[in-house]
């Protein structure tokens, strides 16, 4: 009885609007999710006390549980920013993408995904991806078309492009982790600290363990001589900066104040 009571949630218009808008965006950073939550309260229940974000999302997830859908929290691999995405637990994300992309476009994504997973850096060059166009299933695709499809994946937040190379967006990692673990068991990389799927990060040159950049930053945060957590050998890589939500919040407030100041001046 206690279990069933715990799983029952109450969806108000606030929750429904929040869910609808999150679905529209696909993925949002935590700062934007909090703003979205506040917006939904202002529209539907201005006088209500805004729930803690964690409680608010847990309430929605308890209702979505029977539909095999969940709002999942993750962090970006490059700088550790918290993100949220609506994840379909019943199907692989590639099949979920089928409503937005043609068969040959989905196959292009699979090819890109495989190159990214197999690479040491977590990136695949556009050249290497485009060289596989002739092997695609379905309708033939020219390289120029393939370039446009890759940009479509970027716009839809499935891929990130940096200097002509592609890696998985945080949304894709959140939605596809289980699929990637099952499909590429021999090539998949796992972070030694958080034990989640790792696409890009740093590795120990002695024992080979890997760590996400945000995990590296936190683990060695106050360590003058960083050493590998597994073999204790010297860690030779540059230690990235830790994402600081307080500084980010202050920055957001400053930007907001500047915008409002500019709007008053016009």
Swiss-Prot record:
RING-type zinc finger-containing E3 ubiquitin ligase that assembles with melanoma antigen protein (MAGE) to catalyze the direct transfer of ubiquitin from E2 ubiquitin-conjugating enzyme to a specific substrate. Within MAGE-RING ubiquitin ligase complex, MAGE stimulates and specifies ubiquitin ligase activity likely through recruitment and/or stabilization of the E2 ubiquitin-conjugating enzyme at the E3:substrate complex. Involved in maintenance of genome integrity, DNA damage response and DNA repair. It holds the Pfam family SMC_Nse1. Residues 256-266 have a biased composition (Basic residues). One of its GO terms (biological process) is regulation of telomere maintenance. It catalyses: S-ubiquitinyl-[E2 ubiquitin-conjugating enzyme]-L-cysteine + [acceptor protein]-L-lysine = [E2 ubiquitin-conjugating enzyme]-L-cysteine + N(6)-ubiquitinyl-[acceptor protein]-L-lysine. Residues 1-102 are annotated as: Interaction with NSMCE3. It comes from Homo sapiens (Human). This is Non-structural maintenance of chromosomes element 1 homolog. Ubiquitinated. InterPro entries: Nse1, Nse1_RING_C4HC3-type, PE/DAG-bd, WH-like_DNA-bd_sf, Znf_RING, Znf_RING/FYVE/PHD. GO terms for cellular component: chromosome, centromeric region; chromosome, telomeric region; intracellular membrane-bounded organelle; mitotic spindle pole; nucleoplasm; nucleus; Smc5-Smc6 complex.
